């Protein structure tokens, strides 16, 4: 019998409760550029920002961050962040992990899998059949480790319209996105509200939390409103 499991523990289970904190919460937000995704995410509780490629922190002060330029760097960082022995020390300083430009991180993963198999591109490996299974396994292994870390994790992606005109997160629909979207309690589409004609300033974006024919969004919490009119960290 597995350690810690007994008849008594089965008959006296833990009871779930609706969470009132962001502990262990997995959030995916996506949208077109310049709508405030990164500024809002970095206002979450005790943030630690992982920058893939070009940092989105220009114009933002006092945000703890780590530039990550390869999949090997990410794997090493992820191992430290998710190690149980480091949990207490890390959580005293950080509560929210922000992963910006997830499509860039996935590109890192592609390059890593191809390189470790001595080919230029994923499609060239495995005798020309491609390394698609290896890519999916490598990506999901690290994402699952992060998802189970105990942090509030915020994934940030760009948006694109599919062939039907519906706005979706950018990324590989078969291998990259499923592990992120299937484990997210919140998938929010950041929708711009244009400019205030009187002041000439941009109006705060809205966060859409219920999907329509126009865009994809959803939450697992029936108590959430279908959208947040004023998209701020506090309102989220």
Predicted regions located by residue number:
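Conserved GTP-binding G-domain of TRAFAC-class P-loop NTPases and closely related GTPase folds
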Residues: 161-236
